[in-house]
Amino acid sequence: MADLAKIEEQLSSLTLMQAAELVKMLEEKWGVSAAAPVPMAAASAPAAAEEAVAEKTDFEVVLTAVGGKKVEVIKVVREITGLGLIEAKKLVDEAPKAVKQSVKKAEAEEIKSKLEAAGAKVELK
């Protein structure tokens, strides 16, 4: 252990030029390169991005069209969002409009089915 401490002390006292020279000498002696394998890291990044897109967890429920049963759609929007009558009517009148954002897939599917049962057309984004 004392030898390692001596080596560490000697390496710490090297100047930047001396350290660079030491690296070159060791590369030549051992036949290695001190360069980082950058291409490998760059190649794996797109695969990670594809996985993130495939595993979408938060959805936005968008009311695209009201259909013929506007009153029923307003009732369902009030139930889902907790909005008052005037706010829910305004949301329905402004379709296409997001009814709910950042919801899990199961909840988004449930909201979509309720709105479609009331006669609305809905998209999940």
UniProtKB/Swiss-Prot annotation:
<dbReference type="GO" id="GO:1990904">
    <property type="term" value="C:ribonucleoprotein complex"/>
</dbReference>
<comment type="similarity">
    <text>Belongs to the bacterial ribosomal protein bL12 family.</text>
</comment>
<dbReference type="GO" id="GO:0003735">
    <property type="term" value="F:structural constituent of ribosome"/>
</dbReference>
<dbReference type="Pfam" id="PF16320">
    <property type="entry name" value="Ribosomal_L12_N"/>
</dbReference>
<dbReference type="GO" id="GO:0006412">
    <property type="term" value="P:translation"/>
</dbReference>
<dbReference type="GO" id="GO:0005840">
    <property type="term" value="C:ribosome"/>
</dbReference>
<dbReference type="InterPro" id="IPR036235">
    <property type="entry name" value="Ribosomal_bL12_oligo_N_sf"/>
</dbReference>
<comment type="subunit">
    <text>Homodimer. Part of the ribosomal stalk of the 50S ribosomal subunit. Forms a multimeric L10(L12)X complex, where L10 forms an elongated spine to which 2 to 4 L12 dimers bind in a sequential fashion. Binds GTP-bound translation factors.</text>
</comment>
<comment type="function">
    <text>Forms part of the ribosomal stalk which helps the ribosome interact with GTP-bound translation factors. Is thus essential for accurate translation.</text>
</comment>
<dbReference type="InterPro" id="IPR000206">
    <property type="entry name" value="Ribosomal_bL12"/>
</dbReference>
<keyword id="KW-0687">Ribonucleoprotein</keyword>
<dbReference type="InterPro" id="IPR013823">
    <property type="entry name" value="Ribosomal_bL12_C"/>
</dbReference>
<dbReference type="GO" id="GO:0005737">
    <property type="term" value="C:cytoplasm"/>
</dbReference>
<dbReference type="InterPro" id="IPR014719">
    <property type="entry name" value="Ribosomal_bL12_C/ClpS-like"/>
</dbReference>
<dbReference type="Pfam" id="PF00542">
    <property type="entry name" value="Ribosomal_L12"/>
</dbReference>
<dbReference type="GO" id="GO:0003729">
    <property type="term" value="F:mRNA binding"/>
</dbReference>
<protein>
    <recommendedName>
        <fullName>Large ribosomal subunit protein bL12</fullName>
    </recommendedName>
</protein>
<keyword id="KW-0689">Ribosomal protein</keyword>
<dbReference type="InterPro" id="IPR008932">
    <property type="entry name" value="Ribosomal_bL12_oligo"/>
</dbReference>
